[in-house]
Protein backbone atom coordinates (compact mmCIF):
# COMPACT_ATOMS: atom_id res chain seq x y z
CA UNK A 1 0.00 0.00 0.00
CA UNK A 2 1.33 3.42 -0.93
CA UNK A 3 2.13 5.92 1.80
CA UNK A 4 0.03 9.07 1.49
CA UNK A 5 1.83 12.39 0.85
CA UNK A 6 2.50 14.32 4.04
CA UNK A 7 4.70 17.07 5.44
CA UNK A 8 7.47 14.69 6.51
CA UNK A 9 9.83 12.85 4.20
CA UNK A 10 12.00 9.90 5.13
CA UNK A 11 15.52 9.65 3.68
CA UNK A 12 17.82 6.64 3.76
CA UNK A 13 20.89 5.20 2.03
CA UNK A 14 22.99 8.10 3.38
CA UNK A 15 26.64 7.96 4.38
CA UNK A 16 26.55 6.76 8.01
CA UNK A 17 30.07 8.04 8.75
CA UNK A 18 28.88 11.68 8.79
CA UNK A 19 28.55 13.25 12.24
CA UNK A 20 24.98 13.93 13.31
CA UNK A 21 25.29 17.74 13.54
CA UNK A 22 27.07 18.05 10.18
CA UNK A 23 24.45 15.77 8.60
CA UNK A 24 21.59 17.93 9.93
CA UNK A 25 23.24 21.17 8.76
CA UNK A 26 23.87 19.76 5.28
CA UNK A 27 20.31 18.42 5.01
CA UNK A 28 18.95 21.81 6.09
CA UNK A 29 21.03 23.61 3.46
CA UNK A 30 19.88 21.20 0.76
CA UNK A 31 16.18 20.89 1.61
CA UNK A 32 15.33 24.43 2.74
CA UNK A 33 15.54 25.62 -0.88
CA UNK A 34 12.16 23.87 -1.35
CA UNK A 35 10.39 25.62 1.52
CA UNK A 36 10.35 26.22 5.27
CA UNK A 37 11.95 23.30 7.12
CA UNK A 38 10.34 22.93 10.55
CA UNK A 39 12.69 20.27 11.88
CA UNK A 40 15.22 17.60 10.92
CA UNK A 41 15.36 14.34 12.88
CA UNK A 42 18.57 12.34 12.57
CA UNK A 43 19.29 9.70 15.20
CA UNK A 44 22.70 8.08 15.57
CA UNK A 45 21.50 4.75 16.98
CA UNK A 46 22.70 1.65 15.10
CA UNK A 47 19.19 1.05 13.77
CA UNK A 48 18.75 4.63 12.48
CA UNK A 49 22.21 5.30 11.00
CA UNK A 50 22.22 6.70 7.48
CA UNK A 51 18.59 7.79 7.83
CA UNK A 52 16.76 11.03 8.62
CA UNK A 53 13.36 12.71 8.61
CA UNK A 54 12.86 16.21 7.15
CA UNK A 55 9.68 17.98 8.26
CA UNK A 56 8.31 20.78 6.07
CA UNK A 57 5.71 23.39 6.96
CA UNK A 58 3.94 23.01 3.58
CA UNK A 59 2.90 19.78 1.88
CA UNK A 60 3.94 21.14 -1.54
CA UNK A 61 7.49 21.64 -0.26
CA UNK A 62 7.87 18.01 0.81
CA UNK A 63 6.46 16.83 -2.52
CA UNK A 64 8.84 19.00 -4.58
CA UNK A 65 11.84 17.99 -2.47
CA UNK A 66 11.00 14.30 -2.88
CA UNK A 67 10.74 14.62 -6.67
CA UNK A 68 13.75 16.87 -7.22
CA UNK A 69 16.22 15.18 -4.86
CA UNK A 70 15.39 11.51 -5.42
CA UNK A 71 18.75 9.84 -6.09
CA UNK A 72 20.70 13.06 -5.40
CA UNK A 73 24.38 12.21 -4.65
CA UNK A 74 24.79 13.21 -1.01
CA UNK A 75 28.22 12.62 0.53
CA UNK A 76 28.94 10.13 -2.24
CA UNK A 77 25.71 8.08 -2.00
CA UNK A 78 22.40 8.49 -3.89
CA UNK A 79 19.63 9.43 -1.45
CA UNK A 80 16.46 7.34 -1.34
CA UNK A 81 13.45 9.44 -0.38
CA UNK A 82 9.83 8.62 0.41
CA UNK A 83 7.01 10.10 2.46
CA UNK A 84 7.22 9.18 6.14
CA UNK A 85 4.61 6.79 7.53
CA UNK A 86 3.91 9.29 10.32
CA UNK A 87 3.56 13.05 10.08
CA UNK A 88 5.51 15.78 11.84
CA UNK A 89 3.61 16.12 15.14
CA UNK A 90 3.93 12.41 15.82
CA UNK A 91 7.68 12.51 15.23
CA UNK A 92 8.01 15.59 17.43
CA UNK A 93 6.08 13.85 20.20
CA UNK A 94 8.30 10.79 19.87
CA UNK A 95 11.29 13.04 20.44
CA UNK A 96 9.58 14.85 23.31
CA UNK A 97 9.98 18.23 21.62
CA UNK A 98 6.42 19.01 20.57
CA UNK A 99 5.18 19.92 24.06
CA UNK A 100 8.36 21.90 24.77
CA UNK A 101 7.87 23.97 21.61
CA UNK A 102 4.27 24.72 22.55
CA UNK A 103 5.30 25.76 26.08
CA UNK A 104 7.96 28.11 24.69
CA UNK A 105 5.41 29.68 22.33
CA UNK A 106 2.97 30.27 25.20
CA UNK A 107 5.70 31.77 27.42
CA UNK A 108 6.81 34.13 24.65
CA UNK A 109 3.21 35.18 23.98
CA UNK A 110 2.58 35.84 27.69
CA UNK A 111 5.78 37.90 27.99
CA UNK A 112 4.83 40.01 24.95
CA UNK A 113 1.39 40.67 26.43
CA UNK A 114 2.93 41.67 29.78
CA UNK A 115 5.28 44.12 28.07
CA UNK A 116 2.42 45.60 26.06
CA UNK A 117 0.32 46.02 29.21
CA UNK A 118 3.22 47.66 31.07
CA UNK A 119 3.76 50.09 28.18
CA UNK A 120 0.05 50.95 28.08
CA UNK A 121 0.01 51.71 31.82
CA UNK A 122 2.81 54.28 31.58
CA UNK A 123 1.99 57.98 31.87
CA UNK A 124 1.50 59.75 28.52
CA UNK A 125 4.86 61.51 28.77
CA UNK A 126 6.77 58.38 29.65
CA UNK A 127 8.35 55.95 27.30
CA UNK A 128 7.31 57.50 24.01
CA UNK A 129 10.60 59.28 23.19
CA UNK A 130 12.55 56.23 24.36
CA UNK A 131 10.46 53.96 22.17
CA UNK A 132 11.12 56.21 19.20
CA UNK A 133 14.84 56.19 19.95
CA UNK A 134 14.84 52.42 20.25
CA UNK A 135 13.10 52.06 16.91
CA UNK A 136 15.61 54.36 15.31
CA UNK A 137 18.65 52.41 16.49
CA UNK A 138 17.59 48.82 17.13
CA UNK A 139 17.52 47.51 13.58
CA UNK A 140 20.37 48.87 11.49
CA UNK A 141 20.39 47.43 8.00
CA UNK A 142 23.94 47.73 6.70
CA UNK A 143 24.18 47.60 2.93
CA UNK A 144 26.72 45.22 1.41
CA UNK A 145 28.70 47.10 -1.26
CA UNK A 146 28.10 45.61 -4.69
CA UNK A 147 30.37 45.66 -7.73
CA UNK A 148 29.62 45.48 -11.47
CA UNK A 149 28.43 42.09 -12.80
CA UNK A 150 31.10 39.43 -12.68
CA UNK A 151 31.21 35.67 -13.23
CA UNK A 152 32.52 35.24 -9.67
CA UNK A 153 30.23 35.76 -6.67
CA UNK A 154 31.39 36.80 -3.21
CA UNK A 155 29.49 35.26 -0.27
CA UNK A 156 29.59 36.55 3.27
CA UNK A 157 27.80 36.12 6.60
CA UNK A 158 28.35 32.37 6.33
CA UNK A 159 28.10 30.28 9.53
CA UNK A 160 31.16 28.68 11.06
CA UNK A 161 30.07 25.18 9.99
CA UNK A 162 30.01 26.06 6.27
CA UNK A 163 31.90 23.63 4.08
CA UNK A 164 32.57 23.30 0.37
CA UNK A 165 29.99 20.55 -0.12
CA UNK A 166 27.15 22.53 1.48
CA UNK A 167 27.78 25.48 -0.85
CA UNK A 168 28.28 23.26 -3.90
CA UNK A 169 24.91 21.57 -3.25
CA UNK A 170 23.24 24.97 -3.24
CA UNK A 171 24.91 26.47 -6.29
CA UNK A 172 25.33 23.48 -8.61
CA UNK A 173 21.58 23.51 -9.35
CA UNK A 174 22.21 26.65 -11.44
CA UNK A 175 23.50 26.45 -15.04
CA UNK A 176 27.14 27.38 -15.55
CA UNK A 177 28.30 26.52 -12.02
CA UNK A 178 32.04 25.77 -11.95
CA UNK A 179 33.40 25.71 -8.41
CA UNK A 180 33.29 26.95 -4.81
CA UNK A 181 36.43 28.45 -3.29
CA UNK A 182 36.74 28.76 0.48
CA UNK A 183 39.17 31.21 2.06
CA UNK A 184 41.74 29.61 4.42
CA UNK A 185 41.34 30.94 7.95
CA UNK A 186 37.97 32.58 7.20
CA UNK A 187 34.79 30.58 7.75
CA UNK A 188 32.42 33.49 7.03
CA UNK A 189 33.27 34.18 3.37
CA UNK A 190 33.63 32.22 0.11
CA UNK A 191 33.73 32.67 -3.68
CA UNK A 192 31.60 30.85 -6.25
CA UNK A 193 32.62 30.80 -9.91
CA UNK A 194 30.28 30.50 -12.91
CA UNK A 195 30.95 30.39 -16.66
CA UNK A 196 29.61 33.91 -17.27
CA UNK A 197 28.16 37.03 -15.62
CA UNK A 198 24.54 36.22 -16.49
CA UNK A 199 24.63 32.77 -14.93
CA UNK A 200 26.29 34.16 -11.81
CA UNK A 201 23.61 36.87 -11.63
CA UNK A 202 20.77 34.33 -11.81
CA UNK A 203 22.23 32.35 -8.90
CA UNK A 204 22.85 35.56 -6.95
CA UNK A 205 19.23 36.71 -7.33
CA UNK A 206 17.79 33.29 -6.44
CA UNK A 207 19.91 32.66 -3.34
CA UNK A 208 20.24 36.19 -1.96
CA UNK A 209 19.39 36.01 1.75
CA UNK A 210 19.20 32.20 1.72
CA UNK A 211 19.56 30.86 5.27
CA UNK A 212 22.22 28.17 5.44
CA UNK A 213 21.33 27.91 9.12
CA UNK A 214 18.28 29.51 10.76
CA UNK A 215 20.42 32.37 12.12
CA UNK A 216 22.67 33.11 9.12
CA UNK A 217 21.18 34.71 6.00
CA UNK A 218 23.79 34.54 3.23
CA UNK A 219 24.75 37.84 1.57
CA UNK A 220 25.84 37.60 -2.06
CA UNK A 221 27.54 40.25 -4.17
CA UNK A 222 29.61 40.21 -7.33
CA UNK A 223 33.30 39.80 -6.52
CA UNK A 224 35.58 42.78 -7.08
CA UNK A 225 37.34 42.52 -10.44
Curated annotation (Swiss-Prot):
CDD domains: RRM1_U2B (cd12478), RRM2_U2B (cd12481)
Keywords, alphabetical: Acetylation, Isopeptide bond, mRNA processing, mRNA splicing, Nucleus, Phosphoprotein, Repeat, Ribonucleoprotein, RNA-binding, Spliceosome, Ubl conjugation
SMART domains linked to this entry: RRM
One Gene Ontology cellular component annotation held by this UniProt entry: fibrillar center
Keyword Oxidoreductase: no
UniProt subcellular location: Nucleus
Residue numbers of N6-acetyllysine PTMs: 111
Superkingdom classification of source: Eukaryota
Record's compositionally biased regions (Low complexity): 113-123
Quaternary structure and partners: Identified in the spliceosome B complex. Identified in the spliceosome C complex. Present in a spliceosome complex assembled in vitro, and composed of SNRPB2, HPRP8BP and CRNKL1. Contributes to the binding of stem loop IV of U2 snRNA with SNRPP1.
Entries under PANTHER family matching the protein: U1 SMALL NUCLEAR RIBONUCLEOPROTEIN A/U2 SMALL NUCLEAR RIBONUCLEOPROTEIN B
Function: Involved in pre-mRNA splicing as component of the spliceosome. Associated with sn-RNP U2, where it contributes to the binding of stem loop IV of U2 snRNA.
Name of the protein this chain belongs to: U2 small nuclear ribonucleoprotein B''
Organism: Mus musculus (Mouse)
Lineage of source species: Eukaryota, Metazoa, Chordata, Craniata, Vertebrata
